[in-house]
Amino acid sequence: MKKTKVFIDIFYYKTALSGLKTYIEELLYAVKEHGSDEIEYVISHDISKMANKQFFINSKFRLVRWVFQFRYLFWKQLTLPFLLCKKKIDYVICPDYVAPLFCKSKKIVVIHDNLFWKYPQNYPKIWRKYFTWLIKAGIDKRTEIVTTSNYSKDGLSIIFKNVKIKSIYQSSNTNYSGFNNPKKKFITHIGTFEKRKDLLTLVKAYKKLIDNKFLDYKLVLAGAKNLNGYGRLYFDVKNYIDKYNLNDYIEIPGYIKEKEIKKIYSESLIYVFPSLDEGFGIPLIESMKSEVPIICSDIEVFKEICKDSALYFKAGNHNDLYEKINIFINDSDLRKKLVKLGKENVERFNRNNFIKEFEKIYN
């Protein structure tokens, strides 16, 4: 019996930041550990050789970003279709929003969210027009879209009206497991400084904590300070910190590697995710795995992911966030309860389910 041949394009891993980077890694782990023997998987690149090459990742230099986009376009529209034809591939999985325009293989395109269309003001105008055109151009009648949550599926269904869209929950890194020992009382957020992350609301809530003499609790804001050369939100946050003399209480280590992420989780008393909108929320499942209790905004997607294993505050309201942090600090039983519920909830996000849902598409 002839095996179905599935090609996974991971070229974008060369420049991927935390969210997409983790998605690609987890997809490959899921294939390795739980992929069907009846399917032949072909991976475009050796990820172990790509992992240490960071030249293109989030470069602040426009020329470097342009060079990568040229190489990316050449790969996606010329090299990749040639390889798919040469290797007689049945399905190609593109986890980076974009599929080749011309190829005989059936296409599975992962579009992680609808934020490019929902918040056009958050992206450089010309780049956004180019990238959204590229996304739409690669989608045809042989394409199925995969997205990360039911919330994202609903949003994308408005944009791609005549395309099949399937929601598949990604898995969490198994290394983030049960070692939480918050001796340093960190209140933590891990993620890029982007406008929709609403980190200023978190800093304002934390200021109230300091004003009320909770001086033992340090705020850690880990993640890239700029996104492709644009760092306005970081400077907004930093200016607020400077204005109110909070530098002694807030750490901003910038982009950190996995080993450092594990260490921060292990020392965190609370994980706070104040976003105004997300397609999924990888740090939520990492926190649940790490047994760190979660406070997050009451947006729809977070309720889908966390269910009853998080404490919610009104999105954008720093006073409400302060009240929720205060409750957490003073109620260890509540923290323990939510950690227990989180450990149960996070079992939904496993590698077996992740790849088996993909395989339902091409089986």
Residue positions per predicted region:
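Carbohydrate transferase catalytic cores enriched for Leloir-type hexosyltransferases
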Residues: 1-363
